[in-house]
Amino acid sequence: FAALLSTAFDKNVYDKKDDIDELSARPDFCICGYPVISYDKCIEAGQRYFPKEVIIANVLSYKENILKKYNPEELASPEMPPVFVFETDDDRTTLAENSIGFYMAARKAGVPAELHIFREGGHGFGCGDDNGQTGEWKQLFVNWAKSLNII
């Protein structure tokens, strides 16, 4: 969702009702940890466990148009905020290609971006084990954010 907010912040998705709706929803920066970015890559990752037909019929078919319409890779623009992405190579839930694709889309748009793919750590490690490899993402983010004067 962070990638979507960072790329679709200017989309009208509801009728404005209050003054606050006039404020920009653009975040100052984006952190994506092991993100699902692309519909096609989501299908590909799911095929590790289920046939493609099952995934489409039971999980994604009703959302297909929305998922394709709001693909952060396709919506990346120079107006989006700087992007910090991290992932593990052994993540069995999301493919590293999601992270790589979003990083490349941000770069192509001329947006400051940084990508880290750790060799191992799986999926869902959150803030990670400070003693493990994945725990390094927090300090890497701080260093990156300082280099851009975000913090």
Question: What are these model-predicted stretches?
Answer:
Residues 5-6, 33-36, 87-89, 117-121:
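Active-site-proximal beta-strand/loop segments in catalytic clefts of secreted hydrolases
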Residues 23, 45-62:
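A catalytic-pocket lid/entrance helix-loop region that shapes and gates access to the active site
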Residues 26-29, 80-83, 109-114:
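Loop/turn elements at helix/coil->beta-strand transitions in domains of secreted/extracellular proteins
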Residues 79, 84-87, 91:
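Short beta-strand/loop motif that positions the catalytic acidic residue
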